[in-house]
Amino acid sequence: MNPQRKKRLFLILGLLAGVGVAVGFALSALQQNINLFYTPTQIANGEAPLDTRIRAGGMVEKGSVQRSADSLDVRFVVTDYTKSVPITYRGILPDLFREGQGIVALGKLNADGVVVADEVLAKHDEKYMPPEVTKALKESGQAASDAGAKP
C-alpha cells in the first residue's frame, strides 16, 4: 500500500470513529431526556422505574387534595379507576387543577410508591384530555367522557 492510500485510510477511519463517538453521545443524551408515561395501574404494579424521571397521569381523586398550611406542599392521589397512586408536589398548582380532572405529573417515583413531582400539567379545556390519560382510561374500561362523573 502506497503512503497516500495509507494516509487516506487512516483519515477515513478517524472520521468514522469521530462520527461513531458523536452518535454515541447524542444517543446517550437523548436516552437521559426521555420521560415515559405510566398509568397509576402500571406504577402500582411496579412497572415504573424508581428514581427515574417519569410522567404519571390520570384523574385527581375527589377528596384527595391535601395542602400544607405553612408551605406550598400539596399531596393528592391520581387514579385510572383501577388503581391509585399518591403524588406530592411543592409549588403553585396550575389554575385549572382541581379534583376530578385529568392531570399529568412529571417527577420521580420513590421507594414508598409516591411520585415526587416537580411539574404538574392540568388539562386546559373541558373537552380536552391528555392522550395518554384518555388511552389509560379506555384500557381500564372507563370512557373519557364518563371520567368526570365517576367518584
UniProtKB/Swiss-Prot annotation:
A GO molecular function term, named singly, is: metal ion binding
The residue ranges crossing the membrane are 9-29
Name the PANTHER family on file. Answer: CYTOCHROME C-TYPE BIOGENESIS PROTEIN CCME HOMOLOG, MITOCHONDRIAL (PTHR34128:SF2)
Instruction: Locate the residues binding heme.
Output: H124, Y128
Which protein are we looking at?
Cytochrome c-type biogenesis protein CcmE
Q: How does it sit in the membrane?
A: Single-pass type II membrane protein
Say which family it is in: Belongs to the CcmE/CycJ family.
Q: Which organism is it from?
A: Pseudomonas entomophila (strain L48)
Q: Which keywords has UniProt assigned to this entry?
A: Cell inner membrane, Cell membrane, Cytochrome c-type biogenesis, Heme, Iron, Membrane, Metal-binding, Signal-anchor, Transmembrane, Transmembrane helix
Q: In this UniProt entry, which residues form the Cytoplasmic topological domain(s)? A: 1-8
Q: Subcellular location, in the record's words? A: Cell inner membrane
Gene3D superfamilies assigned? Nucleic acid-binding proteins
Which lineage is the organism of this entry classified under, starting from the top rank?
Bacteria, Pseudomonadati, Pseudomonadota, Gammaproteobacteria, Pseudomonadales
Give the Periplasmic compartment stretches of this protein. 30-151
The record's section on InterPro entries has: CcmE, CcmE-like_sf, NA-bd_OB-fold
Q: Name one GO cellular component term.
A: plasma membrane
Q: What this chain does, per the record?
A: Heme chaperone required for the biogenesis of c-type cytochromes. Transiently binds heme delivered by CcmC and transfers the heme to apo-cytochromes in a process facilitated by CcmF and CcmH.
